[in-house]
Design a protein with these regions (language model features):
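Flexible "cap/lid" loop of the alpha/beta hydrolase fold
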Residues: 2-23
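Substrate-gating cap/lid region and adjacent catalytic-acid/histidine neighborhood
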Residues: 5, 36-40, 44-205
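Alpha/beta-hydrolase-fold serine-hydrolase catalytic core, especially in secreted/extracellular enzymes
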Residues: 65-66, 131, 155-164, 172-173, ...
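Short, charged, surface-exposed loops that flank catalytic or proteolytic processing sites
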Residues: 25-40
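Alpha-helical packing segments of well-folded alpha/beta enzyme cores
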Residues: 19, 148, 213-217
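Glycine-rich, phosphate-binding/catalytic loops in enzymes
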Residues: 14, 102-106, 229
Length: 266
């Protein structure tokens, strides 16, 4: 549910440059601290200082050890682990961040990198939504999560001909706060692992959906196929955008972001 990290290539010197900045910032003189000297620094001080310098978050870093080339290039060439896959995205990946000041800073940062240059080109593809908040959520969720995840699914199912199933998690819990958050980033995880915390309004409907999802995931692990008696999950085929929607009801559908992803051409 975070395919966005493969979509943009960063300068592989940036992590090294930032590491040097950190070593200099923590130094009491003008010389960068060595790794052994850094190990002597209080971890909390390192963390606070690192948060001022490192802003790449979950971006993949080409370190020439674990990652030797851009992740997207690996997917394009089929240079990845040969496994079947369940992959998906949520309806409101970006919604709860939109009014948050930290989100605004993140957007400004990504804009500087040229990541959102194409957003203005897709206004017509989001005009079916009722308000600006929904449109912004749709555009950013599609760019950062949905479309890159479909790219991964396409490559896994075509380049090495593995079996892939794509889900769209659309279930919104009951309550005012839940309505504000929507089907937020990671909303499916309590259902997959049956970890509904006390603060989450959990209904019988949610408990039923939990059993369905767990049985489906377990069947996938046992047999390589997530289909069980209660669901008919279509196998992913490149560029068709067929998904299983986990919502109040389970249903197969063409993903809402299909036209957007085709226009984005990730």
């Amino acid at each position: 549910s975070a395919g966005w990290s493969i979509s943009y290539e960063l300068d592989n010197e940036s992590p090294a440059e930032n590491a040097l900045k950190l070593a200099l910032k923590l130094s009491s003189n003008k010389e960068a601290l060595s790794i052994n000297e850094l190990r002597m620094i209080n971890p909390e001080k390192i963390l606070v200082t690192a948060n001022e310098i490192f802003k790449l978050g979950y971006w993949s870093v080409i370190d020439n050890h674990s990652i030797k080339k851009p992740i997207k290039e690996s997917f394009a060439k089929g240079d990845f682990h040969n496994v079947d896959l369940i992959i998906g995205s949520n309806a409101d990946e970006e919604l709860m961040y939109i009014d948050n000041e930290s989100f605004k800073e993140l957007v400004e940062e990504r804009e500087e990198w040229g990541i959102y240059n194409k957003v203005i080109d897709f206004e017509d593809l989001s005009n079916h939504l009722e308000n600006d908040l929904e449109r912004i959520n749709f555009v950013l969720s599609s760019i950062n999560y949905v479309c890159p995840s479909f790219y991964i699914a396409d490559q896994v199912s075509s380049v090495i001909n593995n079996k892939v199933w794509f889900y769209s998690f659309d279930k919104v819990r009951f309550g005012k706060k839940a309505q504000e958050m929507g089907a937020y980033h990671g909303a499916e995880l309590p259902y997959i692992f049956d970890t509904h915390d006390a603060w989450l309004p959990t209904s019988y409907q949610d408990e039923y959906l939990t059993k369905i999802i767990q049985n489906s995931w377990l069947n996938f692990m046992k047999t390589g196929n997530p289909n069980i008696d209660e669901i008919a999950w279509p196998r992913h085929k490149p560029s068709q955008f067929k998904v299983l929607s986990f919502d109040k009801e389970l249903n197969s559908k063409i993903h809402d972001s299909k036209d957007f992803c085709l226009s984005l051409n990730i």
